[in-house]
Regions:
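Histidine/cysteine-enriched polar flanking segments
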Residues: 1-287
Length: 287
């Protein structure tokens, strides 16, 4: 796996996409807009602050005004959910980029840049107020490469693994959510991490989704498991992988029960399939 500062999961409600997701036609394409900003040669392109943009099968949250066109996105490992990105102008994309995706502090290699250039590449938290309903993510997220438009192996493995994970998670007493996240604006919500502290398996929520290409088709099936920062084990202890994203490769349906038991419930990495990982401080994990 390559290092990244943030993975942006665009909620498309679809299971597959064109080989290059930025080339998708037939409607709105938030991934293309973000790649225009953060891709090679983009306005905010920074080799020391990689933003990985992926499409996902998760559905977007219904907007407050049903006639408005909107998109949703997950930010990981920040564990933020952006429910409403109005798609009537580029303003919401800029707010997402400037308020959440740009680095808070630039790499020392940028010290030679002009003050104006450094300022343009640095996060401005004031932009966060332009995006409504942003929440901390308290759900376990299981992401499976199902990008058949890029590689047929992923198109075969993805749906099979999704079904198997949903089955085994339910048997482990997690509630598997398939519907869109519903956000009611104006409600007083405590979205701090401490508010979501819960033992995984004790009625906790898990979401299993297909995602676009993450590299390494030879490792199909590719799976990334994100454990929310406030997660605890059933024994009430801090989950050893809380706030982390764990990457696995060559996962087959027969391996899923073990991954649920060891990684999601037990906080242990399965070495045989481990491709890498990332923690909440963006440090790469290895064994």
């Amino acid at each position: 796996m390559s290092s990244y500062a943030e993975q942006v999961l665009v909620c498309t409600g679809r299971d597959d996409w064109s080989s290059r997701i930025e080339d998708e036609r037939g409607g709105d394409n938030l991934a293309a807009d973000l790649k225009e900003l953060f891709g090679r040669g983009g306005t905010y392109s920074d080799p020391y602050h990689n933003i990985s943009v992926l499409n996902s099968s998760f559905p977007s949250s219904p907007p407050p005004r049903t006639q408005a066109q909107s998109a949703s996105a997950y930010l990981l490992p920040s564990f933020k959910y952006i429910p409403f990105l109005p798609r009537v102008s580029f303003d919401s994309v800029q707010a997402l980029a400037k308020g959440y995706l740009l680095p808070e502090k630039l790499h020392p290699a940028h010290d030679c840049l002009s003050p104006i250039h450094r300022d343009r590449l640095t996060r401005k938290t004031a932009y966060q107020r332009l995006l409504l309903g942003v929440q901390d993510v308290a759900d376990v997220l299981v992401l499976i490469c199902g990008h058949g438009g890029r590689d047929p192996r992923c198109g075969i493995f993805g749906p099979l693994l999704r079904d198997e994970f949903e089955d085994k998670l339910a048997k482990a007493r997690l509630r598997v959510a398939r519907d869109a996240v519903r956000v009611q604006l104006g409600q007083a919500e405590d979205t701090t991490a401490s508010a979501h502290a819960r033992a995984i398996g004790d009625g906790a929520v898990a979401r299993v989704g297909l995602i676009s290409h993450i590299g390494g088709h030879k490792f199909a099936g590719n799976v990334v498991i994100y454990i929310p920062p406030a997660s605890r084990t059933r024994a009430g202890e801090q989950h050893a992988l809380a706030g982390c994203g764990i990457w696995y490769g060559r996962v087959e349906p027969k391996h899923v029960e073990g991954l649920v038991r060891e990684t999601i419930l037990g906080g242990r990495v399965v070495e045989d399939m481990f491709r890498g990982g990332i923690d909440s401080k963006r440090r790469l994990l290895s064994i």
